[in-house]
Amino acid sequence: MTTATGRIALFIPSFSDGGVEKQMVALAGGFAQAGYPTDFLTRPGELPYLDRLDPAVQLIRLPAARNAQREATIDYLRTQRPLVLMSAKGKDDLLALDARDAAKNAAGGTRVFLRCGIHLSSRPKMVSRNPLRGLWHRWRLRRLYARPDGVICVSDGVADDLAQLTGFARARIAVIRNPTISAGFDARLAEPLDDPWFAPGAPPVILGAGSLAPVKHFEVLIEAAAALMRTRELRLVILGEGKERARLEALAGSLGIRDRVRLPGFVGNVLPWMRRAAVFVLSSEREGSPNVVTEALACGTPVVATDCPSGPREILDGGRFGPLIPIGDAAAMQRAIAAVLDAPLPAATLQSAIAEYTLPRACAGYLRAFGLAG
């Protein structure tokens, strides 16, 4: 029987512009620098963050069409025979497992790992008003998670939720923190930011970042900021793009703060913005392990976050490194932001919160989970 090589393949054909993509690019470089041949399988096109991919990583472009991606992945497994194929996003999990099964005889033992970065039971389809719809999705998840060789989660809360929802044994789930602090972090942090709102002497800036989607609840952040602006000279910047843009801009206008709110769109490097912000605010209704929170802390920037399932509480150590507030509560958010602005924690204290979120620690954890290191 043909044996698999020591090659690691990161599988992300649904690549977009989120935090998962940044983390996987960093991990690929970490594996390659640790001496493991590493492939990065993704879709065609001009994609963000790929300029950060380590030159030692082999970038493999899959076709754009989903059916063609399946056939190309099967062919890849048959010819390259990686030891590990890790699916990085839930959209790609079934494709990875089906390709492994179709290529099994020739792949010679490739093992598929699924990486879960979201709190599954909080998704709208899992809490649908139609109980049959929720049961259907739970049944599908249980079938899906009966198939991988291993599962990796980004937080304890995500792992606990996944085990309960799918029946996958909690003891078999590896929890590995995201590699937020990776190669080039300091250089990206030091990049200049030519923006008058962040110039010395300008009013303090409240910062949010993420896709402009309903799940992020940036409308709550705008409402809280508007209340604060009645008595304080402040500005609000929300980085990201999405279908909620028009609604958020209209809300800022209706609250009379349109000239003090900006939505610059997608930004490839958020660190210079975070470094100069007075406070970073996470307003989401659900997160797995929000990279923006760990990035802000790494910059020494105070954080306010919703106590949503499941990452903020773990990162902020139950509120020790930043206030945790109820989801959707603009008044509580207003009070928390005011408290942080009046008495911010020292930067060194905030930075100490993310000691586990480094590329070397993450790589070591993944290699242990893959059975490649002790």
What are these regions (language model features)?
Residues 146-175, 180-182:
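A short, active-site helix/loop in glycosyltransferases that binds the activated sugar's phosphate group
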Residues 87-93, 116:
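Short His-centered aromatic/hydrophobic patch
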Residues 302-306:
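Short hydrophobic beta-strand element within catalytic cores of glycosyltransferases
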Residues 317-330, 338-344:
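Conserved acidic donor-binding segment of nucleotide-sugar-dependent glycosyltransferases
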Residues 5, 10-18, 22-68, 243:
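N-terminal strand-loop element at the rim of the active site
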Residues 68-71, 111, 121-144, 160:
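Nucleotide-sugar donor phosphate/pyrophosphate-binding loop at the beta->alpha transition
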Residues 21-26, 204, 208-227, 243-250:
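A conserved mid-protein helix/loop that constitutes part of the nucleotide-sugar donor-binding site
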Residues 266, 285:
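Aromatic "clamp/platform" in nucleotide-sugar-dependent glycosyltransferases that forms part
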